[in-house]
Curated annotation (Swiss-Prot):
Biological process (GO), any one: carbohydrate metabolic process
Protein known as: Phosphoglucomutase
Entries under PROSITE patterns matching the protein: PGM_PMM
Family the UniProt entry places it in: Belongs to the phosphohexose mutase family.
Residues involved in Mg(2+) binding: 117, 289, 291, 293
Amino acid sequence: MQATVKRYPTTPISGQTMGTSGLRKRASEVENTPNYLENFVNAMFNAASNLQKPGKIIIGGDGRYLNLKALDIIIRVALSRGFTDIVVGKSGFMSTPAESATIIRRKAEAGFIMTASHNPAGKDHGDFGLKLNMSNGGPAPLEVTSKIEESARNIKEIVIAELNKPLTIDTIGDIEIECEGKKAIVHVIDPLEDYIAYLHECFDFEKLKQFVSKYHLKVQVDGFNAVTGIYNKKVFCELLGLPESSLKNAIPMPDFGGKHPDPNLTYAAELVHAVIPEDSPYDIGFAFDGDGDRNLIVGRGAFVSPSDSLAILSTKYNDIPFFVKNGFKGVARSMPTSAAVDHVTSITETPTGWKFFGNLMDSGKISLCGEESFGTGCCGIREKDGIWAALCWVSILAAESERAQRLVGVKEILENHWAKYGRNYYQRYDFDEVDKKAAEDMMQMMRDNAKTVKCDLNGVPLKFCDDFEYHDSVDGSVTSKQGIRFVFEDGSRIIFRLSGTGSVGATIRVYFDKYSKDYKADQNKMLADMVTVAYAVSQITKFTGREKPSVVT
């Protein structure tokens, strides 16, 4: 195959920003705006420090609409910049955690991940996304994404290779391309290969398979018709021995079959209604988002919040072979995540965004980290990992059942944890697609009033109100304006922040976190006073016109 480098003028396109984890835009906007992807991909190559000289790059994605078009453009821009070692997942597939593992195992300089994560997919009403990962396997840090955004705002020229015939990537193997006298190779690989090898280093699959067989474990796994479908069959059916009937929505589709791939109680209702009832035939259930980095854990009679999952993993790490082999050095959580894990061990508190865990993992300060937004992961790779978290829970069930000489369920583990450590009652309100200026005005009002605001929580006085600022203990960098906190004398917290993962307008997220030794109370009653205070101090209805949240998690 032959390629020729072409250059042509362009003008900047507004709104090409990277948010919490990459570019997120409506697919229709990306498709219908001339040079949208060409501009942004060129900006990435112009500005990212790990793309300034040719090295090995990895490209994959969650299978959503426009991913194949984006992959073609990334390859052709890479060729035009002299890159000769390009690795892509067959048919463009590669989950985010799998790509992180592939970057690390193949010693690549960078990875392009085509995903809008938990956002819907499709031509008309779906989103498209693109993010850049670094040589450590983790998301590009703020200093890199800021430079990419600046390049996109000032771009004047598109540089791209034109191919003499279409590039097809539906067969594993090497494709040789001659570009301007250089021979480049596009390696089309099995997107499972490196990730499954990594999982074998983390878990004892033979032991887990024996446990599943011994207790006839009934499991349901929802892949939302996204990329984890191809991984779920390998992991849960081939390696654990579960029947294929355990898998739901396991065939990847460009529009995810119309499903909203956000693994929470609202959008994973099919799984929740099947597994959580006390008379459910299922012992445990899992759901994973579009690109496979988020997880939902439910059991018969039990929903395991991400915050509780992180806390329980922190107490049961000796049941997880990865930590037995590599040691358990510490835990980090994002600031809005509940303080459940704080009652178990000392923690490092970071802003929302997995990239903030990267320095801590690279420096050996932490082994486990998690976010309230259904993300859990370890230092084995540099992305959160839904399947990894699910296998941790299977490992814990196996170990607890071996100790008890009977099948121990999710509900029993959860309640035993609460009985010992107490319970953090926790809820998140999402106000989606609100007017961006109104949301920003509301946040600024609370910042302005932070030092003078007066409120109490059913008689418990306010301890302080601030705008969370993070000081990185590794590189000394400071990240400000990461969420407004109302912290009360009993440790209860109300938190407001604007999400960086939406594609339209703004999403206001309000978090409620209250600790109690009484773990059997009604959650809504426990948090009712906090909700009333939150509406009052934020004036959210006045600013947005919304009386109720779009989603409650």
